[in-house]
């Protein structure tokens, strides 16, 4: 089955900003999250689709590749499980400019010897809870990594043999080609810039000199981190070529939708149901916060949809000196499954309200006045 367009999945335009994409993701993730839709396969599939679309469009490099090449430009099969390289397009352009200027993009060498390349960066996608994001979190991750082959000790050659000087470039890693009035230096097509070639490759690493293994890394997630932020682990990307420096590992953070709170920057929002008696008479209600429980007074006559602000009960962001606020949106509950006695009491209450006039229902009065003027 063909994949849907990622912008269509999130319901945003192709020129949508990062904030618009993030807000659309949060809204849909809350709607389709498995915790809110137990045993609902359709919602589960929608959630996976929304998550995949956000992972692609929230990454500027992947979004650019998707915009240009579509789904083929962000093939999830590239890279290892959990971690993905994103040096493919840079490598392609590096070859082009390296051929013209005699130096690969991000590398050095050319005249003095074989090309030296920095290793590609890797990306690891990690999902954490809102509580972990707010308070900080130390954990370990397992990522695929390349290490020196133990059989050939990193040479890439079959034991008992060794790499030989490339006969085409004589160990320089580059060759010169004349085209009319121009002399162009380009990467050697035989040794691909290494300056050597391997007549008998190692059977274990197939001549690469390295093998893939999984390594464990310590990751410290700072308190206040937000969805989509990345943590850089220097030197834990793919190894360099010909002595080049290794790339970096970027741990991209995704925060799971919360059952109670919705985050907006450093602020939190929650929906709070209250009895209609508390709304009418006033009282004190208890609300959850990330630090525990808090209470605040509800004035009498509170209407459904009223928002209360609890200062400092949000999240202290990475670049903030103070914590954000918690916004409690009150929803007045209508009682159900009433007994006959309760129904009689409510009827008496309704009658007393009618006798008291419109002063008991200010919103209804203003609404009826607007309707009346509409038909006049």
From Swiss-Prot:
Zn finger intervals (CR-type): 136-214
Q: What Pfam families does the record tag this protein with? A: DnaJ, DnaJ_C, DnaJ_CXXCXGXG
UniProt CXXCXGXG motif repeat ranges = 149-156, 166-173, 188-195, 202-209
The UniProt record gives the binding positions of Zn(2+) 1 as: 149, 152, 202, 205
Q: What remark does the entry make about the cofactor?
A: Binds 2 Zn(2+) ions per monomer.
A GO CC annotation recorded here is: cytoplasm
Molecular function terms from GO:
ATP binding; heat shock protein binding; unfolded protein binding; zinc ion binding
Q: Does the keyword Hydrolase apply?
A: no
Q: Does the keyword Nucleotidyltransferase apply?
A: no
Q: Where in the cell is it found?
A: Cytoplasm
| Swiss-Prot/TrEMBL keywords | Chaperone, Cytoplasm, DNA replication, Metal-binding, Repeat, Stress response, Zinc, Zinc-finger
- Which residues does Zn(2+) 2 bind? 166, 169, 188, 191
InterPro entries tied to this protein: DnaJ, DnaJ_C, DnaJ_domain, DnaJ_domain_CS, HSP40/DnaJ_pept-bd, HSP_DnaJ_Cys-rich_dom, HSP_DnaJ_Cys-rich_dom_sf, J_dom_sf
This protein's domain notes: The J domain is necessary and sufficient to stimulate DnaK ATPase activity. Zinc center 1 plays an important role in the autonomous, DnaK-independent chaperone activity of DnaJ. Zinc center 2 is essential for interaction with DnaK and for DnaJ activity.
Role of this protein: Participates actively in the response to hyperosmotic and heat shock by preventing the aggregation of stress-denatured proteins and by disaggregating proteins, also in an autonomous, DnaK-independent fashion. Unfolded proteins bind initially to DnaJ; upon interaction with the DnaJ-bound protein, DnaK hydrolyzes its bound ATP, resulting in the formation of a stable complex. GrpE releases ADP from DnaK; ATP binding to DnaK triggers the release of the substrate protein, thus completing the reaction cycle.
Q: How does it assemble?
A: Homodimer.
What is the recorded name of this protein? Answer: Chaperone protein DnaJ
- Tell me the organism: Burkholderia multivorans (strain ATCC 17616 / 249)
């Amino acid at each position: 089955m063909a994949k849907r367009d990622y912008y269509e999945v999130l319901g945003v335009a192709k020129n949508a900003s990062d904030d618009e994409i993030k807000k659309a993701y949060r809204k849909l993730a809350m709607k389709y999250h498995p915790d809110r839709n137990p045993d609902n396969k359709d919602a589960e599939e929608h959630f996976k689709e929304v998550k995949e679309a956000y992972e692609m469009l929230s990454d500027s490099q992947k979004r650019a590749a998707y915009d240009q090449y579509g789904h083929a430009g962000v093939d999830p099969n590239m890279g290892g499980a959990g971690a993905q390289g994103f040096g493919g397009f840079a490598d392609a352009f590096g070859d082009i400019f390296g051929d013209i200027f005699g130096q690969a993009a991000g590398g050095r060498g050319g005249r003095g010897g074989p090309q030296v390349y920095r290793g590609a960066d890797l990306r690891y996608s990690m999902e954490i809870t809102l509580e972990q994001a707010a308070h900080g979190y130390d954990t370990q991750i397992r990522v695929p990594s390349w290490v020196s082959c133990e059989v050939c000790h990193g040479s890439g050659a079959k034991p008992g043999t060794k790499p030989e000087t490339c006969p085409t470039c004589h160990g320089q890693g580059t060759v010169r080609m004349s085209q009319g009035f121009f002399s162009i230096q380009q990467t050697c097509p035989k040794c691909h810039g290494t300056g050597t070639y391997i007549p008998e490759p190692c059977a274990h690493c197939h001549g690469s000199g390295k093998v893939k293994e999984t390594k464990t890394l310590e990751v410290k997630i700072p308190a206040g981190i937000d969805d989509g932020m990345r943590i850089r682990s220097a030197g834990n990307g793919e190894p360099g070529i010909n002595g080049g420096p290794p790339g970096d590992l970027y741990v991209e953070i995704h925060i799971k939708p919360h059952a109670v709170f919705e985050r907006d920057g450093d602020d939190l929002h929650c929906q709070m149901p209250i009895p209609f008696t508390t709304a009418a008479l006033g009282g004190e209600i208890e609300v959850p916060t990330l630090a525990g429980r808090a209470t605040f007074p509800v004035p009498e006559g509170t209407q459904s949809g009223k928002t209360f602000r609890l200062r400092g009960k949000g999240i202290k962001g990475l670049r903030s000196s103070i914590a954000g606020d918690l916004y409690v949106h009150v929803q007045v509950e209508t009682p159900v499954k009433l007994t006959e006695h309760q129904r009689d009491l409510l009827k008496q209450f309704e009658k007393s309200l009618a006798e008291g006039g419109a002063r008991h229902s200010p919103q209804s009065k203003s609404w009826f006045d607007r309707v009346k003027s509409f038909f006049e």
